[in-house]
């Protein structure tokens, strides 16, 4: 083989090897789709629509929001998991969808640690222990005493058995040494109505929509927030951890991509979202919606997912035996 031919073949090989890296560096060259497992108009959907324009500007391509509700998020999860691992399809998830639902709905066949790669954390929202005013308690310690004196008599609202609120409340009961009865409802509007009417007396949930107004006018009472320290989202409400050390029920919302998405693509996506979340005006809008901006990169998010799966595993196992 002559020298010219050898050089030509060597150049062709080098070009072939360089193509994947070149394609990654050019990412994105078409719109990026965010699959949302919730209906349009909800809090998560509203947050993404706030991020849509600044993230698209950062990436240099439009960001498309694709709402795919149903099956407790598993329809959207499967769609995203089966997408090409090229960064053009990402899935928005929360703590329940990434650390609870796949292990409760095993028939869905979605192993989040195997099927997804973390992109970034977007926001956090703490769970708050709410009670109807008819419950004769003024604080969390009194509530625990009352619940222990009335085992199985207090009913709490959940959006479906095995959902985040159900599992988080199970962990709360286990740590507190109390026993309450779950009452499942179809959605957040129904659980809120049940708590306001006194149909149920308790709910551990994140605050959204008009819930803060109900707190202010006394239609419901907040006994504790499930964070390590006080939360700016619910000022004046003491941490549950003051009474139950270590109790944490904060809902994190983040983005994941199909497994095997190139790290450089994950980093570029994550940077675009975390940069957008640094805008003070946007952070203020999120706070008004009951969320705090919590921009964390993919590595930190991956570590959090592992911790969350481990934390909820005991409660999920108990649900399986009921």
Put a short name on every predicted segment.
Residues 1-6:
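Positively charged n-region of N-terminal signal peptides that target proteins for export
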Residues 7-18:
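Bacterial N-terminal signal peptides
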Residues 9, 30, 53, 58, ...:
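Short hydrophobic alpha-helices and adjacent helix-cap/hinge residues
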Residues 23-114, 153, 161, 174-206, ...:
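N-terminal (or domain-start) structured segment
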Residues 29-31, 174-175, 216, 263-322:
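An extracytoplasmic/periplasmic, membrane-proximal ligand-sensing/linker region
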Residues 43, 47, 51, 76, ...:
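Hydrophobic alpha-helical segments typical of transmembrane helices
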Residues 79-88, 95, 103-186, 190, ...:
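Hinge/capping helix and adjacent helix->loop/strand transition within the periplasmic-binding protein
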Residues 96-106, 171-175, 202-235:
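A ligand-binding cleft/hinge motif common to bilobed small-molecule-binding domains
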């Amino acid at each position: 083989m002559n020298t010219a031919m050898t050089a030509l073949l060597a150049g062709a090989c080098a070009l072939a090897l360089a193509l994947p890296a070149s394609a990654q560096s050019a990412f994105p060259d078409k719109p990026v789709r965010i699959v949302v497992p919730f209906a349009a108009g909800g809090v998560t959907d509203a947050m993404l629509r706030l991020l849509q324009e600044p993230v698209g500007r950062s990436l240099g391509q439009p960001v498309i929001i694709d709402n795919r509700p149903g099956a407790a998020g598993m329809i959207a999860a499967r769609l995203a998991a089966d997408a090409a691992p090229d960064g053009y399809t990402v899935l928005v998830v929360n703590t329940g969808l990434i650390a609870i639902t796949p292990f409760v709905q095993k028939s869905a066949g979605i192993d989040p640690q195997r099927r997804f790669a973390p992109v970034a954390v977007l926001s956090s929202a703490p769970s708050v222990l709410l009670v109807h005013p008819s419950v004769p308690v003024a604080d969390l310690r009194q509530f625990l005493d009352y619940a222990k004196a009335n085992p199985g008599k207090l009913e709490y609202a959940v959006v479906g058995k095995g959902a985040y609120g159900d599992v988080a409340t199970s962990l709360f009961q286990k740590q507190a040494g109390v026993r309450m009865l779950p009452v499942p409802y179809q959605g957040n509007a129904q659980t809120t109505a049940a708590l306001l009417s006194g149909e149920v007396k308790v709910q551990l949930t994140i605050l959204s929509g008009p819930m803060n107004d109900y707190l202010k006018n006394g239609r419901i009472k907040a006994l504790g927030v499930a964070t390590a320290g006080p939360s700016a989202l619910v000022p004046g409400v003491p941490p549950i951890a003051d009474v139950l050390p270590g109790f944490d029920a904060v809902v994190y919302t983040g983005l994941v991509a199909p497994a095997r998405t190139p790290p450089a693509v994950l980093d570029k996506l994550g940077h675009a979202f975390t940069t957008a979340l640094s805008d003070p005006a946007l952070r203020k809008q999120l706070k008004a919606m009951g969320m705090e901006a919590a921009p964390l990169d993919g590595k930190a998010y991956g570590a959090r997912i592992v911790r969350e799966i481990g934390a909820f595993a005991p409660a999920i196992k108990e649900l399986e035996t009921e």
